Amino acid sequence: EMIDYIKKSLPDCKTVNNVAVVGKKIPDGWLDLRAGIAASSDELERIPNKSTDEMLIYFSSGTTGMPKMILRDYSYPLGHIITAKYWQRVRENGLHLTMSDSGWAKFAWGKIYGQWICGATIVAYDNEKFNAHNTLSLLQEIKLTSFCAPPTIFRFLIKEDIAKYDLSSIEHCSIAGEPLNPEVFYKFREL
């Protein structure tokens, strides 16, 4: 279904040169992404760039209509030093986890750029479906120092018998995406 939609859209997309697909049914003329990755070199040729060069494109959520492209340049990650250092309070040689799927902008600004620049080790923990027990067990096991998640995740975490987990290594927690109700804040702070 998605392939058919893309095929119908291609005539209107004059700048698209190639389409890469993951899967078994790859249309004629399209690229097999996995085969391309397997055939790629392990060496990356660094291409000179300036801070004003285009780096990535986000897409808005489309709350006022169709999603819009938001272009970011190479100076963009530097802005998130402030995010990591002063909001998330990551520290050099600390262990940081932001709960965010890679499809969200928060994945980049809340989990990679400023955090690495500030010297934190980043925890890559992606599961198919959120499970509060598994998450709390991980936080206890790895001795996390900073943690960022949407308030919904904090609400699920406090529904577990959270006192049985040793989360004493966590020095700072932060939220993003929605308001955090006081009950959840105070319960988590008690730990």
Language model feature labels by segment:
Residues E54, S60-T63, H96, L139, ...:
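Conserved S/T- and glycine-rich ATP-binding loop of Class I adenylate-forming
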Residues T63, G119, G177:
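Conserved G/P- and acidic residue-centered "switch" motifs that form tight phosphate/ATP-binding loops
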Residues E1-S9, K25, Y125-N127, Q140, ...:
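Adenylate-forming
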Residues L78-L95, M99-T145, E160:
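Conserved AMP-binding/adenylation subdomain of ANL enzymes
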Residues V21, P27, I37-F59, M66, ...:
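Conserved pre-ATP/AMP-binding loop-to-beta segment of ANL
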Residues E1-A35:
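Structural core segment of the AMP-binding/adenylate-forming
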Residues C13-V19, A120, S168-E171:
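A short helix->loop->beta-strand "cap" motif at the edges of active sites that frequently abuts
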